[in-house]
Amino acid sequence: MGEKRQARQGADVLLQEEPLRFQTRKQVGLLGGNFNPVHLAHLVMADQVQNQLGLDKVYLMPTYLPPHVDEKKTISSEHRLAMLELAVADNPCLDIEPIELIRKGKSYTYDTMKALKEANPDTDYYFIIGGDMVEYLPKWHRIDDLLHLVQFVGIRRPNYPTESTYPIIWVDVPQMAISSTLIRQKVKSGCSTRYLLPENVINYIQEKGLYQDELDNKL
């Protein structure tokens, strides 16, 4: 009788442990940027990486203040976050990661990824960068430690080499000659931005009167 009870108890333990043993890790992409404002090239890049690599999601991660940017020259994080939320609303595979806006201060990728990995130990992160940024990786803050926290994904760019001493997954994404600078200039001059960014983001910019001041257009 005692042996049967022990057998049942052992089976119960196995049943409880089974889900943990067979858990699959989440595969998540991160696309960082100022998103001032977010535009279709950002969204196409995030969507293509998610689809081509089969990631669970790609999070657009707005910076509060990049290490190389003057705090006075960027639009408020409240507006940038609101536009991002509008931009990804119709795509369940895209989302927002606001960790750097919450933390505030200068944003070093290593610090951000360390915090994310500690908060989400079951997640593998894929950090998306443009091919033009790969050559600057040696200058990134604590790059050797960062390599233990993320897998870099490089977006191929014309006239930029794909050779690197760092492990990078390369992805082809349609090239779109759209930039936040271009959009801000068009808004400032009263030109149409249709087909450059989502319609709901265009409406938000108009409703809030964004990018009309010279200060708003410096980044």
Swiss-Prot record:
Catalytic activity: nicotinate beta-D-ribonucleotide + ATP + H(+) = deamido-NAD(+) + diphosphate
Gene Ontology terms describing biological process: NAD biosynthetic process
Alphabetical keyword list: ATP-binding, NAD, Nucleotide-binding, Nucleotidyltransferase, Pyridine nucleotide biosynthesis, Transferase
InterPro entries recorded: Cyt_trans-like (IPR004821), NadD/NMNAT (IPR005248), Rossmann-like_a/b/a_fold (IPR014729)
One Pfam family named in its UniProt record: CTP_transf_like
Coiled-coil residue spans: none
GO MF term list: ATP binding; nicotinate-nucleotide adenylyltransferase activity
Enzyme Commission code(s) on record: 2.7.7.18
Pathway: Cofactor biosynthesis; NAD(+) biosynthesis; deamido-NAD(+) from nicotinate D-ribonucleotide: step 1/1
Keyword set includes Zinc: no
Enzyme category, top tier: transferase
PANTHER family (UniProt xref): NICOTINATE-NUCLEOTIDE ADENYLYLTRANSFERASE-RELATED, PHOSPHOPANTETHEINE ADENYLYLTRANSFERASE
Function: Catalyzes the reversible adenylation of nicotinate mononucleotide (NaMN) to nicotinic acid adenine dinucleotide (NaAD).
The family this protein is said to belong to: Belongs to the NadD family.
Protein name: Probable nicotinate-nucleotide adenylyltransferase
